[in-house]
Amino acid sequence: MMPDPTRTLRVLFDVQHPAQVHLFKHVLWELQATGHETMVVARDKEVTLDLLDAYGIDHRSLSRRTGGLPAAVLELGVREVRTTLAARSFEPDVIVSRVSPPAVHAASVVGARSVVVTDTDIDDTLLGRTFHAITLPFADVVCRPPGLDLPTDPGKQRELGTQELAYLHPDRFTPDPTGLERHGVDPDEPFAVVRLAGWDAYHDVGHEGITESVFRKVVAMLSDRGRVFLSTERGRPTGLDVEPLPVPTHLIHDLLYYADIYVGDSGTMSTEAAMLGTPSVRLNSIDGDADERIFRTLETDYGLLFSFSDGEAALRKVRALMTDESTPAEWERRRSRLLDDAPDVTEELLTIIRETAAPTSTSAVPAPTG
């Protein structure tokens, strides 16, 4: 059924990670600009709420990230209840999320349609399989990259381009050096960005990122050539020539664009740096056949990202990239080739949301009385 262009939609977004703010922000703004109603429910994780505030996006925080599996299970239960209550209040036509059990369950309860966006292979852990098993069957539409196999009805799967390009595509992002200059960073001077993730999410169980010894070697190597800015979910290191990120969270992509190199164990920021044309070296224990499709694509098809599980091999690649004078021009050429192949993911997702919208939201299950 073709969407009715005159109909006003009510769309609820479930945002649980900083990257999801970026993924959905342009979709949300486009919906608002064309007269549709939106609501955002959020999770207090890392800088998620800071980003929403910086972009002026109204939101309701439903829970806070906690450490350990028992606490995470408890938080999930809290989000189930609070997401459903928020949906009852807002009466959405569509609920949009990443792989989020509370979002799809709330949609089922209130009679809304649900759109789930994912680009992640389901790992072999019991936790990973369970999380997807209690999400995907309840979704009306599952958006995934071409070639990703998911254990759900093929009829409700929709192909969606590389998700980071929903906010890093040139139609959506223009690098601005003035924001860096206001915060004491000269974009023409050499600097590197290093990222240390927390490795405490459900899909991180059994894996590890950059070790302390390799981290210190990376910083020593990079600081010989310029400033080193560190984004970390771990404790602040001592005795190293490293600085905290100099810009507010909403300017991180400008910082990544102008950086000479990125080194880290985070999947999201590694991908973002690569797509911005910054040489990106990713180091964690997941590298290999079990690695996510996007990392393999950026490395094999475009040569923008290099993933390693061996610290010494990663250090050798960092050294080679830093000493190769052809690197900047070559990486711009590689990025251009990626963008030539890339659609505007925001437009794709907008179309999917409009086509998925339920005819009405009056089919919602009434709230219990008494």
Predicted feature locations:
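A donor-sugar binding/catalytic signature common to diverse glycosyltransferases
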Residues: 95-106, 255-294
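A nucleotide-sugar donor-handling region in carbohydrate enzymes
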Residues: 139-209
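A conserved, positively charged/aromatic
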Residues: 115-117, 126-142, 256
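Conserved nucleotide-sugar phosphate-binding/catalytic loop shared by glycosyltransferases and other
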Residues: 32-76
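C-terminal amphipathic helix plus adjacent low-complexity
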Residues: 325-370
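Donor nucleotide-activated moiety binding/catalytic core segment of transferases
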Residues: 78-83, 234-269
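Catalytic donor nucleotide-activated moiety binding site of glycosyltransferases and closely related
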Residues: 45, 55-59, 63-66, 194, ...
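Catalytic binding pocket for nucleotide-activated donors in carbohydrate/polymer assembly enzymes
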Residues: 275-326
